[in-house]
């Protein structure tokens, strides 16, 4: 859909390798600019020591998820079977399908899952999936509601999840 719009605006067809080249360049830029959220490594170490099932469930394509994990040195915490993309299930947050699929694959009941989300769509998906949902907002702009609490530092989750 976006490519069709670009072709209309440019009044010419895009090169056949446009999407591939765009993704390649995006990957290079992403690997240069993405940084790890402060406290993420410490939190993942604590949760891993507990032997809790953990995963990544993202709206992004799998290749982008993998690239982000590599660029932030977090790939050591996740096996391929613990990484889920909305592209795998054909449904994107705020639809809860991705979270429900991840829970099923990990053998964990939704009511026993904790979702940590940095997007409103993800928060809505976690709530709709019947999972305890915690919003991550590095600024104090987001306040707790009756359905979700927010943390502003991942280290604040260590006592809760550790």
Predicted regions span which residues?
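Asp-based, Mg2+/Mn2+-dependent phosphohydrolase catalytic module
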Residues: 45, 61-162
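N-terminal helical cap/lid subdomain that shapes the substrate entry/recognition surface
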Residues: 1-52, 66
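Conserved phosphate-coupling serine/threonine residues in phosphotransfer and NTP-handling enzymes
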Residues: 58
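Short coil/turn segments at beta-strand junctions that form active-site/ligand-binding loops
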Residues: 51-53, 111-112
């Amino acid at each position: 859909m976006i490519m069709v719009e670009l072709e209309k605006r440019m009044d010419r067809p895009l090169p056949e390798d446009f999407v591939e080249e765009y993704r390649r360049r995006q990957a290079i830029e992403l690997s240069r600019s993405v940084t790890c959220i402060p406290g993420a490594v410490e939190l993942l170490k604590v949760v891993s020591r507990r032997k809790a099932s953990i995963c990544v469930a993202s709206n992004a394509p799998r290749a982008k998820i993998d690239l982000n994990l590599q660029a932030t040195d977090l790939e050591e915490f996740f096996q391929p079977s613990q990484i889920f993309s909305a592209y795998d299930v054909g449904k994107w947050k705020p639809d809860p399908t991705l979270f429900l699929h991840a829970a099923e694959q990990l053998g964990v009941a939704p009511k026993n899952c904790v979702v940590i989300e940095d997007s409103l769509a993800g928060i809505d998906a976690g709530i709709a999936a019947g999972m305890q949902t915690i919003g991550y907002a590095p600024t104090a702009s987001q306040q707790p509601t009756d359905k979700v609490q927010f943390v502003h530092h991942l280290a604040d989750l260590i006592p809760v999840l550790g």
